């Protein structure tokens, strides 16, 4: 097959992929041409070491700016995506400095004639798929090769061996033990690489048939998941004098202690970066620092070091976050303050547009390999054209094919003003319908020397498109706990991905105003060719569900172990004894699950990756990992059993310590605390139940003769023993958490937590008053019925209106008496009230729970419930047929203290029940534990045919939306109480597979899953917790509408309180 125009560009150097160093530089002068003596005075030769270790000589004028040299280098290499690269040199202090384009070289480089500058990657994008040129990815792979050798890219021995094996495949071709050993003996990839020799050879055997382009992509794909990917340390110290390392990445400024990341200051949180002498200053936005200091200070070694790091931060921020370079400030007439430095190159957005629009003619280049061997697999396979598919794993197919692939990096965030204020998150990679089609060919590999080989070409499959995910780590607003609790494991398994289509024509859809910066993938509405490379075994999808939910679970634990701990340490608000009790019981659990997640990620990577096609199925299982870890969980039973003690002591401490109470309330208002704080204390025990359910599905899927069945069955037995032992503890813990949450949210009530009191149901009913039917929030407990009204002061708390003891209570239907649909009468010892439910099913659920609770209350002692601080009704007893018409309550009476609570979260079940006119029972909350799910979904834009990729977490009857699974807090939420889930109808014009529809009144959303299994799982869990938890299917139509008679009495409420997806979209 002949060479395809525009695929390869000729490397004008003699450097090879083997990395052999060239002893002499190559001049840019023509052969036999020399400079005249006069010209030699006006020119100087500068040596530049390229990424393949060859040295080039460039002739420039002594007083020219750095941009002149850079332009010569880019032209010499025919490098299109040149803005990712730069030239660096060592200064007097022997640390590396980037050559500034707008400054004369002689003012930067000392003795430039003797200096050796080197080409290096300057900006590391979070995803290699954002690099559109194969040649650019090749240079990035060479940079990572250099970083490995210089020990900048620190990683485990296994990961280093895997990286080197892909570099070997790229440079010398398919595995040959003799040649591999000779090559590794002659070339150093890693210090002391002899220790990893056998691992390298073992990994290399698995890459048979992999082309150089695919190997490059695999190197980038593995490296970008390492915490040290693209990190360049700058030694510093904090205000206390602690030695730290500062670094900068696409996401913001990073703080390390040793090689452990302890803090991340995202660009969106930073208001301004500055330096003053040796001090580097980070000013945060007011909403980030809150009551804490708004300026963080770090001390570097010298003013030059500090200014150098500041310049790098400015360049990184401009390149990744802005659409265009900021305009230069006007020069001061008399005096100027501060540095005039600014980034002078193109931003990533501008570079993307330039390459997309054709920017520069692509000149073919050849990959010349010495001692390479022919890969029959790569040379014989030639599949038809296919569209890009977002699949899991290391995105290359086991069967290579020729493919038409369009890579399109992210759209930029909205234009920001010069400097650093008002920063917004940038989007991730998109597939653009108009992006140019790139066809790749692989140079023929032969067994002879490269000098005698002719460059024949063959179609090869480009690595798959990008998965959107930010750099590793999590952002923090304050100093962190011990570094041991923050160590990061290698994650080889990427997140769930969704199939995206490409088209040759048509404009990209417009991003929705909300979540536009969060979208991680976009699709056009044209017909899509499907070609997904992922295992089809249901066990694989169950394993991937374990991975996805484990990632969410670990993030939930970090809310306490990292974020809450950080605030407590900073404020010194918690007694030492309570702090020891809290973290001694949750830290070991957190560390265990970090290790477990690491194992699952690596297993899934091997299961999904291209190497799995050459194995005998040893890695296409998960039971051995589950069995080992489920058995270890037994050792943590004592920790799980003490969580109710932790919750009780925490509640007592907040009552007696005003400072702790203030810190607690303030922390709950932070975005990272997306659920009530005490809810996260339930997660460890609830996760055990989830393991049991997942293992049950695995055992049901496998036949008894399957190699993984025995391990899964034993793991199920082990976790069942643990959950059985902890069942009473979980029930007690869930009840205690609910009572604690209600006591915090209800105004005018104290001592709600009482021995023997159990929560039964909460929900919205309409109470008959002198004004007619008034909406009230009712709470049914094992000893009383409590009802509240929403505050009219703008706060989202509920104020106690009254309570009725269950002893002696009687409940009767009274629709005929009052002519109000779905109403019933509650007769208490001293009061009678008439209430109406929104539907027949709601009425039946309330009456059933009330009657059951009344019967159970007969066995409780005679002591009345104690509720201090709320209005207790002590009116004269009335006859059983007399109805109490509630006074005009909304205009008078003490409202209680609500200061500081106006921002209270509005997606709790209490608030959602209020707005959706529904109710939730204790059984529903317990069932919700079994209906938790995480993963990537595509959300359809409202006003276009585009799809937006989001990480979605379903918990506590609510969908939470993130850009990626590594985000610390959700961008939006959608409570699902009251929603119905169904398949799209023909009128919806949705022509995609695995799409489900969510609807509540006029609010309609479409979501798309990546496979049949995930589609069915999302449908299943949402059905169980949508319109009304626990609803029988036969009641679907009856419950979805209010009764006509009641509509006149009930004012239509907004579907969902802000913040939520309803209101924003």
Swiss-Prot record:
Transmembrane segments: none annotated. GO terms for biological process: actin cytoskeleton organization; cell adhesion; hair cycle process; neuron remodeling; osteoclast differentiation; podosome assembly; Rac protein signal transduction; regulation of integrin activation. The modification Phosphoserine is found at residues 389, 440, 863, 880. SMART domains: B41, FA, FERM_C, PH, RhoGEF. Residues 44-324 form the FERM domain. Interacts with PLXNA1. Interaction with PLXNA1 or PIP5K1C lowers its guanine nucleotide exchange activity. Dissociates from PLXNA1 when SEMA3A binds to the receptor. Interacts with PIP5K1C via its FERM domain. The interaction with PIP5K1C is enhanced by SEMA3A binding. Interacts with RAC1. This is FERM, ARHGEF and pleckstrin domain-containing protein 2. It comes from Mus musculus (Mouse). The gene is Farp2.
């Amino acid at each position: 097959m002949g060479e395809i125009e525009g695929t390869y560009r000729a490397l004008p150097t003699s450097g090879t992929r083997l990395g052999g160093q060239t002893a002499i530089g190559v001049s840019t002068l023509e052969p036999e041409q020399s400079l005249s003596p006069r010209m030699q005075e006006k020119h100087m030769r500068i040596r530049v070491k390229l990424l393949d270790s060859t040295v080039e000589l460039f002739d420039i004028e002594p007083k020219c700016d750095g941009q002149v040299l850079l332009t010569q280098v880019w032209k010499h290499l025919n490098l299109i995506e040149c803005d990712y690269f730069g030239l660096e040199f060592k200064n007097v202090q022997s640390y590396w400095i980037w050559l500034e384009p707008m400054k004369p070289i002689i003012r930067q480089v000392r003795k430039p004639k003797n200096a050796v500058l080197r080409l290096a990657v300057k900006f590391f994008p979070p995803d290699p798929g954002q690099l559109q040129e194969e040649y650019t990815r090749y240079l990035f792979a060479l940079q990572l090769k250099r970083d490995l050798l210089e020990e900048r890219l620190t990683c485990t021995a296994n990961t280093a061996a895997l990286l080197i094996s892909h570099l070997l495949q790229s440079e010398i071709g398919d595995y040959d033990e003799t040649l591999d050993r000779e090559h590794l003996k002659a070339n150093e990839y890693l210090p002391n690489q002899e220790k990893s020799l056998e691992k390298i050879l073992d990994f290399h055997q698995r890459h048979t048939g992999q082309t150089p382009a695919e190997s490059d992509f695999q190197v980038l794909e593995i490296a970008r998941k390492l915490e040290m990917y693209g990190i360049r340390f700058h030694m510093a110290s904090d205000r206390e004098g602690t030695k730290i390392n500062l670094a900068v990445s696409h996401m913001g400024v990073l703080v390390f202690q040793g090689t452990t990341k302890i803090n991340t200051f995202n660009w969106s949180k930073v208001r301004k970066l500055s330096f003053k002498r040796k001090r580097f200053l980070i000013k945060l936005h007011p909403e980030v620092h809150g009551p804490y200091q708004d300026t963080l200070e770090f001390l570097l070694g010298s003013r030059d070091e500090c200014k150098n790091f500041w310049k790098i931060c400015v360049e990184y921020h401009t390149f990744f976050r802005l659409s265009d370079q900021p305009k230069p400030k006007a020069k001061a007439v008399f005096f100027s303050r501060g540095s005039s430095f600014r980034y002078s190159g193109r931003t990533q957005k501008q570079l993307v547009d330039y390459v997309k629009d054709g920017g520069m003619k692509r000149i073919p280049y050849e990959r010349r390999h010495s001692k390479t061997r022919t890969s029959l697999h790569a040379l014989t396979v030639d599949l038809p054209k296919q569209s890009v598919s977002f699949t899991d794993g290391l995105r290359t197919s086991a069967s290579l094919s020729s493919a038409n692939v369009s890579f399109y990096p992210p759209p930029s965030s909205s234009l920001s003003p010069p400097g650093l204020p008002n920063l917004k998150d940038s989007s991730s990679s998109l597939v653009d319908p108009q992006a140019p089609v790139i066809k790749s060919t692989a140079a023929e590999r032969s067994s002879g020397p490269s000098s005698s080989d002719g460059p024949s070409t063959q179609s090869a499959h480009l690595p798959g498109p990008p998965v959107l995910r930010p750099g590793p780590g999590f952002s923090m607003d304050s100093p962190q706990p011990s570094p041991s609790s923050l160590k990061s494991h290698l994650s080889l398994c990427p997140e769930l991905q969704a199939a995206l289509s490409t088209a040759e024509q048509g404009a990209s859809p417009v991003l929705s105003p909300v979540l536009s910066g969060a979208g991680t993938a976009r699709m056009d509405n044209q017909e899509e060719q499907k070609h997904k490379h992922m295992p089809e075994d249901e066990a694989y999808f169950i394993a991937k569900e374990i991975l996805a939910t484990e990632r969410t679970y670990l993030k939930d634990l970090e809310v306490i172990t990292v974020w809450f701990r950080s605030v407590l340490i900073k404020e010194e608000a918690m007694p030492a004894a309570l702090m020891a009790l809290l973290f001694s019981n949750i830290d070991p659990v957190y560390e265990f699950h970090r290790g477990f997640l690491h194992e699952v990620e690596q297993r899934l990577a091997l299961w999904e990756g291209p190497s799995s096609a050459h194995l005998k199925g040893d890695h296409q299982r998960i039971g051995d990992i589950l069995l080992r870890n489920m058995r270890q969980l037994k050792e943590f039973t004592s920790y799980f059993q003490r969580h109710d003690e932790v919750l009780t002591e925490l509640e007592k401490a907040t009552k007696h310590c005003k400072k702790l109470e203030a810190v607690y309330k303030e922390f709950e208002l932070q975005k990272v605390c997306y659920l009530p704080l005490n809810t996260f204390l339930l997660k460890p025990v609830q996760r055990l139940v989830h393991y049991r359910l997942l293992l049950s599905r695995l055992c049901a899927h496998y036949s008894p003769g399957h190699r993984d069945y025995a391990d899964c069955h034993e793991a199920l037995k082990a976790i069942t023993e643990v959950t059985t032992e902890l069942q009473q503890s979980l029930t007690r813990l869930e009840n205690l958490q609910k009572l604690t949450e209600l006591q915090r949210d209800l105004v005018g009530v104290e001592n709600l937590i009482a021995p023997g009191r159990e929560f039964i149901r909460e929900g919205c009913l309409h109470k008959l008053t002198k004004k007619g039917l008034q909406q009230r929030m009712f709470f049914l407990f094992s000893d009383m019925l409590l009802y509240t009204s929403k505050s009219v002061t703008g706060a989202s708390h509920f104020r106690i209106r009254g309570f009725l003891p269950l002893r002696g209570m009687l409940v009767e239907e009274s629709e005929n008496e009052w002519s109000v649909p779905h109403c019933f009468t509650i007769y208490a010892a001293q009061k009678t009230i008439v209430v109406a439910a929104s539907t027949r099913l709601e009425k039946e659920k309330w009456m059933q729970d009330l009657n059951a609770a009344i019967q159970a209350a007969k066995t409780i002692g005679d002591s009345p419930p104690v509720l201090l601080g709320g209005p207790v009704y002590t009116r004269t007893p009335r006859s059983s047929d007399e109805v109490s018409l509630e006074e005009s309550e909304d205009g008078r009476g003490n409202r209680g203290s609500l200061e500081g609570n106006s921002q209270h979260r509005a997606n709790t079940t209490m608030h959602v029940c209020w707005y959706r006119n529904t109710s939730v029972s204790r059984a529903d909350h317990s069932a919700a534990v079994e209906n938790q799910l995480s993963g990537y979904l595509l959300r359809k834009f409202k006003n276009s045919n585009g799809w937006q990729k989001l990480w979605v977490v379903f918990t506590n009857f609510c969908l939470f939306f993130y850009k990626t699974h590594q985000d610390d807090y959700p961008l939006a939420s959608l409570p699902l109480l009251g929603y119905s889930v169904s398949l799209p109808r023909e009128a919806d014009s949705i022509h995609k597979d695995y799409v489900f529809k969510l609807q509540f009144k006029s609010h309609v959303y479409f979501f798309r899953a990546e496979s049949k299994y995930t589609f069915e799982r999302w449908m299943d869990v949402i059905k169980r917790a949508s319109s009304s938890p626990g609803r029988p299917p036969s009641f679907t139509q009856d419950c979805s509408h209010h009764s006509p008679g009641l509509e006149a009495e009930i004012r239509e409420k907004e579907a969902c309180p802000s913040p939520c997806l309803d209101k924003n979209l």
